[in-house]
Amino acid sequence: MSNIPTELKYASSHEWIRKEEDGSYTVGITEHAQELLGDMVFVELPEVGDTVTAGEDCAVAESVKAASDIYAPISGEVIAVNEALEDSPELVNSSAYGEGWFFRVMPSDESEVDALLDAEGYQAVIDED
């Protein structure tokens, strides 16, 4: 069974967000998602300064099994990307909620966070799959 930290919020498309002290949100994919994808071989990230829109694809995770679009859980400006993933995409597998984060977003509409799932709601989504 996948680890689902209770302090994070989740999208039904298997992304997570964590609020940071500066008001931005760090985005990654869940442990469940990386388990489904398998060993990561390449991650394509948005550029710093890009504007992302909630529900739209903005990154790609490529594994030995498949390439999967990564969707923005909230809208805003990308203020940082995890450059470590360029050389070490396997961090997504080994540390989905830590060193395997994808990018950080400064939200344009923080109310979008309220539409995301808590850990219990995300567990229900996994159970339906």
Curated annotation (Swiss-Prot):
Keywords: Lipoyl. Pfam families: GCV_H. Binds 1 lipoyl cofactor covalently. It comes from the Bacteria. InterPro entries: 2-oxoA_DH_lipoyl-BS, Biotin_lipoyl, GCV_H, GCV_H/Fam206, GCV_H_sub, Single_hybrid_motif. The glycine cleavage system is composed of four proteins: P, T, L and H. Belongs to the GcvH family. This is Glycine cleavage system H protein. The lineage of its organism: Bacteria, Pseudomonadati, Pseudomonadota, Gammaproteobacteria, Alteromonadales. The gene is gcvH.
